[in-house]
């Protein structure tokens, strides 16, 4: 199969190939493009010769690998392969071999190979928090849970790999670990577009929401197209799994017509026939239009007493997925009510610090929708004054940067510090994005005396803490130096630092 997808300003060529010829096919694709470019009179980039492609094909060829893949499919089991390892089954039921010592499929003890429950979590915002809520629920059920996220691969309470592992590599590492009883995989847009789904089958999948982030990349330039990408997880649940969707998201609601789909809703005007909802401040399932309250929103620390509505959605999604995976009510309630969502269990995701009356929230919000929900949370907490530290990476287009600034303006904070994110400039001048945000804030009506800039995140946080007083709330949008920011705040809380007093660090330093 060969397909051409045309987008604004570019095109993508896709071709199918056997399992043991995919890398060669990709290189052949590049070579074909380079030759076409040369025929048009342009100088192509470096590419492989036909002889190189033949050698690559021979090196990649592995009939035994294909035989094992076919046998795994016959037994209804997951199959993973990469440059070094081949495996069948998953978690505690996994068998793994080096690519150069693959067994005859007939010699594999298939009775002792099995799969573990796997859920996929995707969407624009809320993915990482949801997989961590699910891991807490599974732990309460006595299961060894593993998860992948933008922070790494986590098993139980231990981070076994650090970095962005929201693609296939993280899934393979986790699902080849024989200690894992159940797995929750954060699935990012980029990974799906580059490599596809990390697993072919999943027992459940949850799509949190659709928002304006990374538009313009890989030909995805509208929210409807982005929704199509996020809903690719439905392919993994099509055979026997359950698709959980945010039913309040207009771009996801139509997909609820699919078989075995479940909606999560916050304060619906009418109870659905089935689903998981917040109703009168309580969370629980709805069956045959009858609501059963499992716990109060105030009993879920991540919701900050109900102020953090986005975490109510995350909790409902986690609840729905857990139930689909067969986890009992008691474990769901215990997991959600004991998940602190603090700087240790969920770093950088709506972490609230109380510094002797000065409240500080550290959050990863980096798109307009994420900023909107965290600013709504701030408003619900009713501070005397509000300060926002804001910045953005350089790979967002101008419209997305402007929208982030406009969202901030709409909530009329008392003070805004715009940070420069030099190591995330990604092709722009170091201060280009911060200067654009500052100007957009001015254009939106924020006076100069309510605005400031800082050369980096640490300096911005230092200035924010010097500004804050008892009764205020500081919203620190932290990406570049999150760990240092959290360490500083933990130290200030532990030493009962008083707002208005000297800080234990210089403006350009982290914690001493």
Question: At which residue positions do the language-model features occur?
Answer:
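ATP-dependent carboxylate-amine ligase
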Residues: 308, 320-330, 334-512
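Flexible active-site lid/hinge loop adjacent to a nucleotide/diphosphate
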Residues: 155-257
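Walker A (P-loop) phosphate-binding motif
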Residues: 107-151
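Adenine nucleotide phosphate-binding catalytic loops in nucleotide-utilizing enzymes
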Residues: 220-227, 231, 260-372
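A short, gly/pro- and small-residue-rich
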Residues: 199-210, 225-231, 262-268, 438-439, ...
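A short helix->loop->beta-strand "cap" motif at the edges of active sites that frequently abuts
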Residues: 237-242, 259-262, 413, 448-449
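Residue-level signal for inorganic ion chemistry
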Residues: 72, 148, 186, 208, ...
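Preference for protein termini
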Residues: 1-117
């Amino acid at each position: 199969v060969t397909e051409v997808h045309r987008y604004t300003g570019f095109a993508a060529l896709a071709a199918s190939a056997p399992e043991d010829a995919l890398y060669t096919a990709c290189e052949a694709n590049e070579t074909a493009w380079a030759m076409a470019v040369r025929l048009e009179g342009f100088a192509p980039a470096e590419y492989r010769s036909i002889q190189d492609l033949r050698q690559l094909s021979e090196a990649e060829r592995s009939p035994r690998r294909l035989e094992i893949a076919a046998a795994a499919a016959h037994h209804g089991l997951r199959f993973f392969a990469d440059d070094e390892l081949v495996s069948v089954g998953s978690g505690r039921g996994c068998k793994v071999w080096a690519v150069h010592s693959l067994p005859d499929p007939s010699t594999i003890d298939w009775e002792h190979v099995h799969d573990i429950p796997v859920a996929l979590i995707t969407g624009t915002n809320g993915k990482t928090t949801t997989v961590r809520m699910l891991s807490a629920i599974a732990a309460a059920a006595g299961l060894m849970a593993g998860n992948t996220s933008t922070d790494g691969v986590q098993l139980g309470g231990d981070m076994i790999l650090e970095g962005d592992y929201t693609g296939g590599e993280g899934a393979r590492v986790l699902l080849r670990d024989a200690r894992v009883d159940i797995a929750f995989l954060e699935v990012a847009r980029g990974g799906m577009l580059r490599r596809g789904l990390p697993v072919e089958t999943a027992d459940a999948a949850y799509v949190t929401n659709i928002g304006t982030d990374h538009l313009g990349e890989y030909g995805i330039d509208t929210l409807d197209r982005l929704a199509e990408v996020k809903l690719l997880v439905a392919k993994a649940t099509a055979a026997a799994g359950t698709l959980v969707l945010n039913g309040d998201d207009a771009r996801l609601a139509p997909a609820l017509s699919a078989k075995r789909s479940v909606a999560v809703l916050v304060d619906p005007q009418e109870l659905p026939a089935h689903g998981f909802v917040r109703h009168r401040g309580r969370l629980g399932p709805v069956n045959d239009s009858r609501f059963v309250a499992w716990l109060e929103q105030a009993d879920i620390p991540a919701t900050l007493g109900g102020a953090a509505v986005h975490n109510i959605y995350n909790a409902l999604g986690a609840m729905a997925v857990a139930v689909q995976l067969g986890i009992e009510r008691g474990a769901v309630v215990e997991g959600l009510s004991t998940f602190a969502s603090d700087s240790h269990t969920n770093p950088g995701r709506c972490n609230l610090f109380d510094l002797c009356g000065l409240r500080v929230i550290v959050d990863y919000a980096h798109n307009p929708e994420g900023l909107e929900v965290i600013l709504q949370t701030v408003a619900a907490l009713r501070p005397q004054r509000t300060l926002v530290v804001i910045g953005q990476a350089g790979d967002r287009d101008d419209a997305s940067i402007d929208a982030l600034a406009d969202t901030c303006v709409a909530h009329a904070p008392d003070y805004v510090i715009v940070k420069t994110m030099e190591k995330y400039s990604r092709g722009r001048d170091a201060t280009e994005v911060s200067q654009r945000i500052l100007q957009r804030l001015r254009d939106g009506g924020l006076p100069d005396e309510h605005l400031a800039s800082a050369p980096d995140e640490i300096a911005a946080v230092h200035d924010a803490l010097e500004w804050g007083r008892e009764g205020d709330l500081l919203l620190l949008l932290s990406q570049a130096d999150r760990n240092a920011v959290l360490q500083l705040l933990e130290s200030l809380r532990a030493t009962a630092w008083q707002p208005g007093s000297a800080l234990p660090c210089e403006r350009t330093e982290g914690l001493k």
